[in-house]
Amino acid sequence: MIAIIDYGVGNLYSLRSSLKAIGVDAEITSDKEKIMGADKLILPGVGAFKDARAKLSDNGLDKLIIALAKEGKPIMGICLGMQMLFERSYEYGVSEGLGLLKGEVIAMQNRLSPELKIPHIGWNALNFVKDSKLNKYIKEGDFVYFVHSYFASGCEESLVSFAEYGEQIPATVEYGNVCGCQFHPEKSGEVGLKILKAFCE
C-alpha cells in the first residue's frame, strides 16, 4: 500500500485518483500506524512552506517521516512536498525542512528576469541530468505541469532533471530512497502517470 500523507495540505484526491488509474493501492492517511505499515510514502503539498512545515510538526509526522526515510522506506515529495525534503526554505522567513536532501528552497523572483511570470504555471520539457527510476518510462523532452513560485537550489547531489524557465529549474530529484517532483505528476497526463508508476513499483 502507498500512503499519501494527509496533513491538511495538498491535492490529495486527485493524486489518489491518478494512482488508482495505474492500478496502485493508495490510502490518504494521517494515521501513524498506517504510515509505518505502508510500502512507500508520498508527501504532497501546495501553499506556503512555513505553514505546511508547521502542520507536519504539530502532529509529529515530520519526525516519523524522517525516521522512516532513514530506515530506507521510499518516499516521494510532490511540489511543496518535494521542497520540504530539503534543508530549509526562505519563503516568509527561514524555515527548516526535513533535511532528507541537501539544498534549500529560494524565491524565483530573486533569480529570474522581470519579464518572466511568477508563479511559474504551465507545461515544460524535462531535461535529464542522470539516470533515475523516475525516468524509467519517460523520455527526455516529455512535458510536465508546473505551478510554483519557489524552487530548489544547491541540489546537485540529488538532481535528476530540470526544466528551462529563465534558468534551470530542478524538476525531479532522487537520492537513495528519497525522491521528488517539483511539478504535479497527477496533473501531467500520461507522462505524470508513468512517473508515478515508476516510483510505485
Segment roles from a protein language model:
Residues R88-Y165:
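Pocket-forming structural segment of enzyme catalytic cores
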Residues A26-G37:
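Short acidic low-complexity segments
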